[in-house]
From Swiss-Prot:
<comment type="function">
    <text>Aerial growth, conidiation, and dispersal of filamentous fungi in the environment rely upon a capability of their secreting small amphipathic proteins called hydrophobins (HPBs) with low sequence identity. Class I can self-assemble into an outermost layer of rodlet bundles on aerial cell surfaces, conferring cellular hydrophobicity that supports fungal growth, development and dispersal; whereas Class II form highly ordered films at water-air interfaces through intermolecular interactions but contribute nothing to the rodlet structure.</text>
</comment>
<dbReference type="GO" id="GO:0009277">
    <property type="term" value="C:fungal-type cell wall"/>
</dbReference>
<feature type="disulfide bond">
    <location>
        <begin position="127"/>
        <end position="140"/>
    </location>
</feature>
<feature type="disulfide bond">
    <location>
        <begin position="59"/>
        <end position="120"/>
    </location>
</feature>
<dbReference type="Pfam" id="PF01185">
    <property type="entry name" value="Hydrophobin"/>
</dbReference>
<dbReference type="GO" id="GO:0005576">
    <property type="term" value="C:extracellular region"/>
</dbReference>
<keyword id="KW-1015">Disulfide bond</keyword>
<feature type="disulfide bond">
    <location>
        <begin position="43"/>
        <end position="126"/>
    </location>
</feature>
<dbReference type="InterPro" id="IPR001338">
    <property type="entry name" value="Hydrophobin"/>
</dbReference>
<dbReference type="GO" id="GO:0005199">
    <property type="term" value="F:structural constituent of cell wall"/>
</dbReference>
<comment type="similarity">
    <text>Belongs to the fungal hydrophobin family.</text>
</comment>
<comment type="subunit">
    <text>Self-assembles to form functional amyloid fibrils called rodlets. Self-assembly into fibrillar rodlets occurs spontaneously at hydrophobic:hydrophilic interfaces and the rodlets further associate laterally to form amphipathic monolayers.</text>
</comment>
<feature type="disulfide bond">
    <location>
        <begin position="60"/>
        <end position="95"/>
    </location>
</feature>
<protein>
    <recommendedName>
        <fullName>Class I hydrophobin rodE</fullName>
    </recommendedName>
</protein>
Length: 145
């Protein structure tokens, strides 16, 4: 009879049931798999929960309140002959289509998580107003990740 590897040697737990010891690498692999599954599920659950259509979902470097626009946003609006007092919703600056990479960056660096340190220079938003080639986008609502 061949000896059993040490990591599979039987032990008794507190209920006197036979239990095999699992190698530490199995536990780490299981933890990583669970983490990846939860992150994926959170991505899909958040995106699917939004009522925003794919064409309106954007990733902007800045989202600004229309009542508190910085000089750059005000200058762009003037060039486009748009009165800032008529705006509803946030104003997105330097926006592009919301990609998986942008969404993952937002999800992994949001406050309260310890998955990745750092920050994203991005804000996920649903913008139903005019989009001026991503330079400035109107009628935005931030998507909570």
């Amino acid at each position: 009879m061949h000896p059993r590897p040490e990591h599979l040697s039987p032990t008794l737990n507190h209920n006197h049931r036979l239990k095999l010891k699992q190698p530490a690498t199995t536990s780490r692999m299981l933890a990583r798999t669970i983490l990846a599954t939860l992150v994926s599920a959170a991505c899909f659950a958040t995106v699917n929960a939004q009522t925003c259509s794919a064409t309106n979902a954007v990733c902007c470097q800045q989202l600004q309140d229309p009542d508190n626009l910085n000089a750059d946003a005000l200058n762009l609006l003037r060039l486009l002959n748009i009165n800032p007092n008529t705006l509803t919703g946030a104003v997105g600056l330097t926006c592009k289509r919301l990609t998986e990479a942008c969404f993952a960056c937002l999800l992994l660096t949001r406050p309260g998580t310890s998955l990745v340190s750092g920050s994203c220079n991005a804000n996920a938003a649903c913008c139903t107003g005019n989009n001026y080639n991503g330079l400035i986008v109107l009628g935005c609502t931030q998507i909570q990740v």
